[in-house]
Amino acid sequence: MKLTKFVFFFVTIFSGSLCAAEIQGNVIRVLDGDTIEVKTLPAKIVVYEVPIRVRLINIDAPEKKQPFGRWSTSQLKTLVAGKQVTVSYSHKDRYGRIIGHVFTTNGTDASRFMVQSGAAWVYERYNVDESLPALQREAQEQKRGLWADANPVPPWEWRYKHN
């Protein structure tokens, strides 16, 4: 009986993190350097489809009005706009956006691409990918993208000052 209670408790507590979902679709809009809209691929059952808003996990890109904001958006557009992607996720944020790993058909992880090219920061507060800080350091050392700026301001600081 105690074992049954323990198993039930374990499954209840950790089920949210164990249940991952996946969607496939075409990117119909790139809103900024870390947010896209995906239209899911047609299913066998016809349903009313709405675009699904997805925020790339582990990163924070410059805001549109921030230095490098438009450039960051264009980097993500080059990678995924109009293309098929697979999104793997386990939760949504407070705005209802899926927070997920976005992969192109050739396997490129959009979050890693954005950090490696200097188009986004590792979002240290929420990052769970231990390899991303090294990619960011490499981008900084090579002065790629936003790291070409002498004093780039992280988006979370920029939002605090401008909102």
What residues fall within each predicted segment?
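Small beta-barrel nucleic-acid-binding modules, primarily SNase/OB-fold domains
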Residues: 2-8, 17-163
